[in-house]
Amino acid sequence: MISLLAVAVLAGCSNPETRSQANRGFDYEQETLRTAPLLIPEGLQAPRFNTEYVIPKGTAQGVTGKVLDIRPPTQVLPLVRGSEAMTEGSGLWFYQQRLDQPLERELNQALTVFFEQTDTDYDAVANGFESSGDAIGAPSQQFRWQLMPDAVRRAVAVQVQSTEGGGVLAQDRLRAEASMLNAFSLSYQRELSRQQELLDQGPIALTLDAGQGLLLAEQDYDRTWKRLITLLPRLGFDISNRQQALGYVDVEFDGLSKGDWQDLRLPALDIPEQEYRIQLGDLGSRTSLSLSNKDREPVAADVLSKLVNTLAPAFERTDLVR
């Protein structure tokens, strides 16, 4: 038990984010350069010395010893896709990615979620928030969060500033600002990932356009691609090649047993067991899917009709993509 406690204590002391003082002695601060005059034996002349490169005596600049903070600097990290660190101050630029709501409102909501998840006291003020915070490796401080929209860049900056007085060192203030901003950025990225996961698992409507000889998915290209790649193996297709950038999937249909279709609670897919290519087309908010045989010839209308009878309810089922 004692050994475990010792390990825990040592691990805590060796944390580079919190240990600001070196773990060696500081006797070197009292040391001086010892010099002695050159002794010239009797009968010899003293050598001539070049005095051009003599190091002058001067006062020591900067901190040393126990006062020297050895912690690595904390850097503002753009953890969210479409974000960029500001060139001045502790802040991040976030660029508009979604069109369903204004970015400034979205960031306001994200900051509120961040404060509530971390049990942080906060108040809404003009163009931002004021909050308390305990940053890693820095004393507890008060912070001012400011949102600065830029209509030209279609972006909003989130800048955080420590509002503590002169009792906090400048290096601790900068470290705390960067640490708090990184914590918010990580929280925001997690929330965006959660929302993306919900969207990816949501139902997608799939219909047949008999006139064009293709299927239409009421979702964008990326989500339709993910849904298709997830479902194909479950529906009896072996994927032999896929190229998302080129928009096609090469498969071979091996079929499923009657019992497997009953377990899936889907209409059985009764098409020839052979090689196919599924070609996707990006239509903005919708995606087209066409089916061809191994010779890259469009399949018959009845084959496409049978495919949509099975694939459409599968695209609607959220339990099949979890």
Swiss-Prot record:
Location within or outside the cell: Cell outer membrane
Gene: bamC
Quaternary structure and interacting proteins, as annotated: Part of the Bam complex.
Function: Part of the outer membrane protein assembly complex, which is involved in assembly and insertion of beta-barrel proteins into the outer membrane.
Lineage: superkingdom: Bacteria
Main location: membrane
The organism's taxonomic lineage, starting at the top: Bacteria, Pseudomonadati, Pseudomonadota, Gammaproteobacteria, Aeromonadales
Organism: Oceanimonas sp. (strain GK1 / IBRC-M 10197)
UniProt keyword annotations, A-Z: Cell outer membrane, Membrane, Signal
One Gene Ontology term, aspect cellular component: cell outer membrane
Signal sequence coordinates: 1-22
The UniProt record lists the keyword Repeat: no
Pfam families found in the cross-reference section: Lipoprotein_18
DNA-binding among keywords: no
Any single GO BP term: protein insertion into membrane
Similarity annotation: Belongs to the BamC family.
InterPro entries with a match to the protein in the record: BamC, BamC_C, NlpB/DapX
Protein name listed in UniProt: Outer membrane protein assembly factor BamC
